[in-house]
Regions:
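N-terminal loops that bind phosphate or other acidic moieties
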Residues: 1-169
């Protein structure tokens, strides 16, 4: 038994492509896409997410980790989890979709439990403190008194936990 993965994306093609990529690196892990709407448009579908979660839960599951692309996909995934008989078996990862999915799939392939799979996905986004000094600085930031590494260099974005304008756009 391994941890199962569910990919929730606004785009069916993105979900399918991300699953295809991760499956190349973790052939024994069940990875299910739940992308797009039922009528083929961009958006999320509560029914698609619930179906993927139910399918993943039906297959000797050691837990399910869900990865999402954008904010409303998170809300859809959270809503779907609330409808499950055992919502405690599902963890939502706060990670970039493609990179996080690949890391999660490899961790699941290696036998990690659901918390370890979630942690692997999230470590892609937030490197462990021990590795921060090895990350190339993104800018010189005198107001912080240090070089930003693996974080937004825009001061207003840093104050908002990474949400803010992107320089040069």
């Amino acid at each position: 038994m391994t941890v199962k993965l569910v990919v929730v994306s606004h785009s069916e093609k993105i979900a399918d492509g991300a699953v295809e990529l991760a499956a190349q690196m973790a052939p024994d892990v069940l990875i299910l896409p739940a992308g797009g709407t039922d009528d083929g448009r961009i958006g999320t579908s509560l029914e698609r997410v619930m179906a993927a979660l139910e399918q993943a839960g039906d297959v000797n599951s050691d837990g399910i980790v869900v990865l999402t692309d954008l904010g409303s996909a998170v809300m859809t995934a959270e809503s779907a989890v609330e409808f499950l008989a055992d919502p405690s078996s599902v963890l939502l990862a706060d990670a970039p979709l493609v990179e996080g999915l690949v890391a999660a799939a490899v961790a699941a392939q290696a036998g990690a439990d659901s918390a370890g799979v979630k942690e692997a996905a999230e470590a892609v986004y937030r490197p462990p403190a021990a590795l921060v000094q090895r990350i190339a600085p993104t800018a010189n930031a005198p107001p912080r008194g240090r070089l930003p590494r693996g974080e937004d260099r825009e001061e207003s974005a840093a104050a908002l936990a990474g949400i803010g304008p992107t320089p040069g756009l």
